[in-house]
């Protein structure tokens, strides 16, 4: 947890929920959009705090919500350096270091209108990672490449 000095926490600990740490600076609000947080959740956002590894980072704490696998996969695409910590009774019971998978299925859409995934309801879109920095993924059906900007646009603009 980030500290103001060695004894004072910026944000208090949570009893149960999720802490998403090591989010690239400026991406915390995008993470919240992915999680579709409704009224009633207590949330703490810490943005642009110092990080030895990253220079600056964001942190998101959400009480009484555990991030599921689909949400974690979407977060990975916009915050590949993030770590998801599941908290129960003030203790970290699970820690997941996110990593962009080699293949992503069903989370992104191909931008090629002629791709079979845009014309056949049974064809599930799939993308193969071709680079991480910058993030680029290639459609496994038609070889169309989408970049990080397109991925962000799809994830943050999605209504699913």
UniProtKB/Swiss-Prot annotation:
Binds 1 zinc ion per subunit. GO terms for cellular component: aspartate carbamoyltransferase complex. Zn(2+) binds at residues 110, 115, 139, 142. GO terms for biological process: 'de novo' pyrimidine nucleobase biosynthetic process; pyrimidine nucleotide biosynthetic process. Keywords: Metal-binding, Pyrimidine biosynthesis, Zinc. Transmembrane segments: none annotated. InterPro entries: Asp_carbamoyltransf_reg_N (IPR020545), Asp_carbamoylTrfase_reg (IPR002801), Asp_carbamoyltrfase_reg_C (IPR020542), Asp_carbatrfase_reg_C_sf (IPR036792), Asp_carbatrfase_reg_N_sf (IPR036793). GO terms for molecular function: metal ion binding. It comes from the Archaea. The keyword Disulfide bond does not apply. Its cofactor is Zn(2+). The keyword S-adenosyl-L-methionine does not apply. Contains catalytic and regulatory chains. HAMAP family: Asp_carb_tr_reg. Belongs to the PyrI family. Involved in allosteric regulation of aspartate carbamoyltransferase. This is Aspartate carbamoyltransferase regulatory chain.
């Amino acid at each position: 947890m980030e500290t103001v000095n060695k004894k004072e926490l910026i944000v208090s600990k949570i009893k149960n929920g999720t802490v998403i740490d090591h989010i690239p600076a400026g991406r915390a609000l995008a993470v919240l959009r992915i999680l579709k947080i409704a009224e009633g959740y207590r949330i703490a956002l810490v943005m642009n705090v110092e990080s030895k590894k990253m220079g600056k980072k964001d942190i998101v704490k959400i009480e009484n919500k555990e991030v599921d696998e689909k949400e974690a996969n979407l977060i990975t695409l916009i915050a590949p350096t993030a770590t998801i910590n599941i908290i129960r009774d003030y203790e970290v019971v699970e820690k997941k270091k996110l990593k962009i998978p080699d293949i992503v299925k069903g989370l992104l859409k191909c931008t090629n209108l002629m791709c079979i995934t845009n014309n056949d309801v049974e064809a599930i879109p799939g993308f193969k990672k071709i680079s991480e920095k910058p993030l680029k993924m290639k459609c496994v059906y038609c070889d169309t490449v989408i970049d990080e900007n397109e991925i962000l646009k799809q994830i943050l603009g999605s209504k699913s």
